[in-house]
Amino acid sequence: MVGTINESMQNMKIGAKETAQSAKQGIKNAGQSSSKTARDVMGNPVPGSYTAGNTANDGDSSYASSKNLPGNADIGATSSERTAYAAPQRAAVDTSNVSPPSTQTGGYASKDTTSTYEGAQPLSSQSSRSSNYTNVKITATQNNVDALTGAPIRIVTTTNARIQPDEKTLQDLLEQRQVALREAREAEEELQRARQYNDRSTSEALELEARAKKAAQDAELASERAREAQSSIERSASLREKQAREEAERAATALREAELKHRLAQANADVDVANSKLDIALKNEAAWKAERESSLAHQKAVIDSARAELERARHEAAVADATYKKEHYEYNALVAELEERNDNTLRTASIREAEARNLEVHMEDTLKDARMRSRNATEQVEVVKREINSEIDVYRSSVEKTKAELASYQKGLPSQKEACDRELDDATRALQAAFQDRFNAAKLRVNQFDVDSRQQLAMLTKKVRDAEDAEEKYRISCHQREEEITRCATQAYDAVKAAEKRNETIAEAARAKENEAKDLYSKAESITQDLNAKRSHPPQPANLDYSSAIQRAQERLTLEESKLTDLRTAEPSQYVNDVEVARRALRDAQAEQSKVESEYNSVKGSKLYTTEPVHPHAVTTNEPTDVSTKSKSAAYHYPATTETVSSKAARSATTPAYVGGATKTPSTTKAVESTPSTLPTSASTNAAATTTTKKPKAAKSTAVRDDVSSASSDSDKGTTGLGKSESKSSRKERRSSTSSGHGLMNNVRHALGMSNK
């Protein structure tokens, strides 16, 4: 059962992970699409636009368009990618370069300035790179048109969604989308305030119109004086009149082109809005699908839990049955074991009693045998002692007898020697007296007696010595035999003592066995009591009914499976219809864009001048007079949406919030703004103050990608590009309908033959 529950929980976790991963992948794809759109917008501005760093220091407006290069688009993309995971930020930029008319002699002295309103600054990238979050960038774009100049203003609202990898991801994403929409509405309100601020320039336009009327009156008076002048002046006046008509026609064409360009910008803005709505609809659809998959995974997990509960109920019923059987088998085994233990205990007790009796009998027999052997040894010792004593007495009597013979012989020896000496003396005297022969015979007998006596003494002495030696040897042997008999008697006595001691040990063992037998009998009695108690209380089956629990688990499983079927057969969400509506709106906007662009291409680039102006008061500026080499994006352009942190920090302290303010930026701010706007975002605010103005190496190129090509580069959203086949030269000619210096009114004054005073 535990394995089944673990498996179901594992499957549930895997399903939730797959759902979260699919939702994250969809959100990531949407974020990549939005990031790509933002990079295209920031790196590829539309025709007529230039970034905050497009103001040249040498006063040549021809460099205004060369600062925004295709090569810088990559840098802009890199900047966008580096700030893709920052905090939500908003930027409304209007780079209209319409400047109020100024009275001058010899040209214009001031250059166009650019101001930017910025939203929240990005957070530190370190805090947004946490491994516990998945960062998704959501970009919402709104396009509006300035009421005075007709310049489009693009509001880009960027929200960085920091998604946690858990089941609250979708809800957090929806809340962050609401935050992004709310910031877009706030940006729109700021745009309204910017328009109100720009309305103050209307009075300047009226003043310019009054000056134009006054200049027209002055021109009429001059024309009257010219008709009164010489014929050469009349020819010059007729030539100026012809040029004025041509310039008027050119101005009308420029106005038409400006109107079409405004419509084209509006169409491009509508396409961007449709793309944004399509992105939002696709994200909503992906979020709905992810939520649906999450609900399905949750319901499957609930079904797995119900199935596990059913299996658990069945398992508990089986466990209860098995428990009863186990207890019954254990009871039977315990009764049999108790019976066997009782029999074994009684048998062992009887064996121990028999062993104790045998030990007692063995102890008595051993003691009797030892005592008998000890008594026999003692009797044998006494017999041997008596025999030894009698034999010793015999040897002693023989020795005494020999000693007595020796003593009697030695005792009679002096008398015999004296007798022999007397006889020798007698013989000697007789010899001396009469018989020499007798003396010799007596001397011979004396010598013989000495020899015999010595031999007899030696023999007797040897006999005595031999008798003593024999007595000594016999005494020694008797002593050894006595010692051996004594040792045997001692051993017999020791055996008796050992037998007595052993009998004590045997007696203790016999008593221990008797005690063990008593304990075994008492144990057998307790076992008999336990056996009787077990037999009187056999195990009973558990009175638990598990069928109701199994039925409830089965009903819950059926109910959850029906809920899963309802979820699978549910109607598709409204987000699918919203996607279709957004796609139709995008197709309509692209069709309108194609229509306006074709009309604009048919009107742009009209060349109406046939002669050069010869008015003595022709416009002279400090800029090059070659109109074809100047930027044609002075009056109508798109704002750049990518700016460096350093330029933002430098302008936020010195410039007004919107374009058109009367406050002029200091030279330090100009130096900061003249840097390329596509610097990496890692540049700090301190570095902005020391940044020197450097022109990019690719500044020779004057080609700028228009909004149509930037919209068509977003191929992953299905946007149809309309300007891919246009060359750089055609895009340059597209901006040739307006004046390069200071907007449409300069063209009107030039066409009317008026000079700036």
Curated annotation (Swiss-Prot):
A single GO molecular function term of this UniProt record: ATP binding
Q: Where does ATP bind?
A: G718, T719, T720, G721, L722, G723, K724, S725
The UniProt regions of compositional bias labelled Low complexity, in chain numbering, are 674-693
Annotated membrane-spanning segments are none
Could you tell me which residues belong to the region Disordered?
1-131, 224-244, 589-633, 657-757
- For whether the record's keyword set contains Transcription, the answer is no
User: Which GO BP terms, alphabetically?
Assistant: long-chain fatty acid biosynthetic process
List UniProt keywords, sorted A-Z.
Answer: ATP-binding, Coiled coil, Nucleotide-binding
Q: Keyword Coiled coil: yes or no?
A: yes
Renumbered to this chain, the Basic and acidic residues biased-composition regions fall at 589-598
- Coiled-coil annotation reads 166-604
Compositional bias (Polar residues) spans?
1-11, 19-36, 51-69, 94-118, 619-632
Q: What does this protein do?
A: May be involved in the metabolism of very long-chain fatty acid-containing phospholipids (VLCFA-PL).
Q: What is the designated name of this protein?
A: Protein lsd90
